[in-house]
A protein has these predicted regions:
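Acetyl-CoA-dependent GNAT
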Residues: 12, 31-80, 95, 152-156
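A short, well-structured alpha-helix characteristic of acyl/acetyltransferase catalytic modules
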Residues: 1-38, 154-157
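Conserved catalytic-core motifs of GNAT/GCN5-like acyltransferases
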Residues: 106-109, 126-142
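Terminal substrate-recognition subdomain of acyl/acetyltransferases
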Residues: 140-157
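Short glycine/proline-centered loop/turn elements that form peptide/ligand docking sites
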Residues: 85, 89, 113-116, 132-138
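Conserved GNAT acetyl-CoA-binding A-motif
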Residues: 98-108
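Conserved acetyl-CoA-binding loop-helix of GNAT-fold acetyltransferases
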Residues: 82-95, 118-122
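Conserved active-site tyrosine of GNAT-family acetyltransferases
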Residues: 120, 125, 149
Length: 157
């Protein structure tokens, strides 16, 4: 699978790219919001101008009564604020709606992650509510709130 956005390409993480993604997820600006995963299997690499600059993943609820999907994403600090994360989320969201038939998508950034929230709003995600003490900050051990955001298929921009 390879998905092309305006500026990024999303494709399965290739052998050896886990080391690159591990370095990215440990950058202070990324580590503030992401715990390093055990591995990057199942994630899609975000590629910009031939360079892996982050990763995006999705999970699906396939029960026809609740056919929706969720998205998680991280991007290297030096490429944040350039629209690449927005492009990656929009590209994956379009595929989840058109190819996989999902009618609703969710994303749940830390409530304090204002840059991510701004980016997701550009794709069409709307705040639904605060999930209190949703995730533990892996650096401090403190619980932090998350903002649940969702997007219906016809709201995708």
């Amino acid at each position: 699978m390879e998905l092309r956005g305006d500026d990024v390409v999303l494709r399965p993480v290739a052998d050896g790219e886990g080391r690159v993604l591990d370095r990215i997820v440990r950058e202070p600006e990324v580590a503030a919001w992401w715990s390093p995963p055990e591995d990057f299997a199942g994630m899609l690499a975000i590629v910009f101008e031939g360079e892996v600059v982050g990763a995006i993943q999705f999970y699906e609820e396939t029960d026809p009564e609740f056919h929706h999907a969720g998205i998680d994403v991280f991007l290297t600090a030096r490429h944040q604020g350039k629209g690449l994360g927005t492009d990656a989320v929009r590209t994956l969201a379009r595929w989840l709606v058109t190819a996989r038939g999902h009618h609703r998508l969710t994303i749940d950034p830390a409530a304090a992650n204002t840059a991510a929230i701004r980016s997701y709003r550009k794709v069409g995600f709307r705040p639904v509510g605060i999930m209190r003490a949703y995730g533990r900050d892996h650096r401090t051990g403190r619980w932090q709130d998350a903002l649940l955001m969702d997007l219906l298929a016809d709201e995708l921009t």
